[in-house]
Amino acid sequence: MVTGFVQSLIKLCGLNWTAPDFTTLCRRQKYIDIQISYQKSRDGLHLLVDSTGLKFLGEGEWKRKKHQPEYRRQWRKLHIGIDAETLQIRAVQLTTNNVSDSQVLGDLLDQIPQDEHIDSVYTDGAYDTKRCRQLNTDRNELLRTVNLAKQCFSGRTLWKKWSGYHQRSLVETKMHCIKLLGDKLSARNFDSQVDEIHARMAILNKFTELGQPHTQVVT
């Protein structure tokens, strides 16, 4: 159906092209190099980092609820870093579900150009490791991981206000936008899954580039 629709559009444009079929697209997907465009922040970069899971094998939630868990369910883990100012995705990494968040932070930071200054990195407690602290020190960022000692000293509410931890809600919103494009991966090959994710990230950045709503607190 989709192939016929695309072929009709090509014909209306007066082009002598042939619409590729689904099999051809699937085979060529893993060889496509998708570039994710973005806009730089006016000031220093404040990077918000988080991860989520995407299913690529197994039945839906309704069948699992009615007929007990599906043992063949498999997941990929998506790690992203977004700009707190532009809300565009600046770093993305797809891994297997047995890779911890702290192991991927270095790969995410490496995707940020070395000549671009990173003011701070906002993460959750999963990144509160010695290795992650060293990675942030190497890039001269102000580490914003959960610090239990400071929380106990000042209280959780004051600590969140002082550290700016509430900004992490922005990356949670971006995760929701990603899931709106699909909460599972259609490709089975890992390289194809990476390209599928990069395509989604490129689309989301284009949408974000069109503009964000302006909000104002009403009291």
Please give the residue ranges for each predicted region.
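Helix-centered, glycine/charged polyanion-binding patches within enzymatic domains
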Residues: 125-177
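Hydrophobic alpha-helical segments
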Residues: 177, 181-184, 205, 209-210
